């Protein structure tokens, strides 16, 4: 079943909005929440196979339903995922920290911002 899902993941963009949203929410949850590395990496791999332009729009609309952005551990997992998807999504994810009173969230955003600068200097 795993091969069928990953080979057909690109078909999600052709599903109805309700169905595609449920699939993306589930993949977001598994990409950012669990501690089981296989679930994290498999979900990220599936998401990375989708059109980043389409996916960025979906994620921005759905992330708060699947990921506890106010938890620093889940927020870091979300930034890791965003880094894989696109610079636009990562920038948006980093900007979320502006509204946080949690110093660990702010620190995570700063860490990823520094990584962006470092990666562009290479």
What residues fall within each predicted segment?
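Short inter-helical turns and helix N-cap capping residues of alpha-solenoid HEAT/ARM repeat scaffolds
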Residues: 2, 35-36, 70-71, 101-106
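Alpha-solenoid HEAT/Armadillo repeat architecture
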Residues: 13-14, 29-33, 48, 67-68, ...
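Amphipathic alpha-helical scaffolding segments comprising HEAT/armadillo-like alpha-solenoid repeats
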Residues: 17-30, 53-65, 87-98, 119-122
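Short charge-dense sequence patches
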Residues: 8-13, 26-45, 59-64
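Short, intrinsically disordered, low-complexity segments enriched in Ser/Thr and Pro
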Residues: 97, 101-122
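Structural detector for internal amphipathic alpha-helices that build alpha-solenoid repeat scaffolds
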Residues: 3-17, 40-53, 73-85, 107-116
């Amino acid at each position: 079943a795993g091969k069928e899902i990953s080979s057909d993941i690109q078909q999600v963009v052709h599903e109805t909005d309700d169905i595609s949203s449920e699939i993306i929410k589930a993949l977001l949850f598994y990409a950012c929440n669990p501690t089981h590395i296989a679930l994290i990496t498999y979900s990220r791999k599936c998401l990375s196979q989708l059109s980043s332009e389409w996916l960025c729009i979906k994620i921005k609309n759905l992330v708060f339903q699947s990921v506890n952005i106010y938890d620093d551990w889940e927020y870091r997992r979300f930034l890791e995922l965003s880094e894989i998807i696109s610079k636009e999504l990562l920038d948006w994810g980093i900007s979320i920290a502006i509204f946080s009173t949690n110093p660990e969230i702010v620190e995570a955003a700063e860490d990823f911002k520094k990584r962006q600068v470092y990666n562009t200097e290479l």
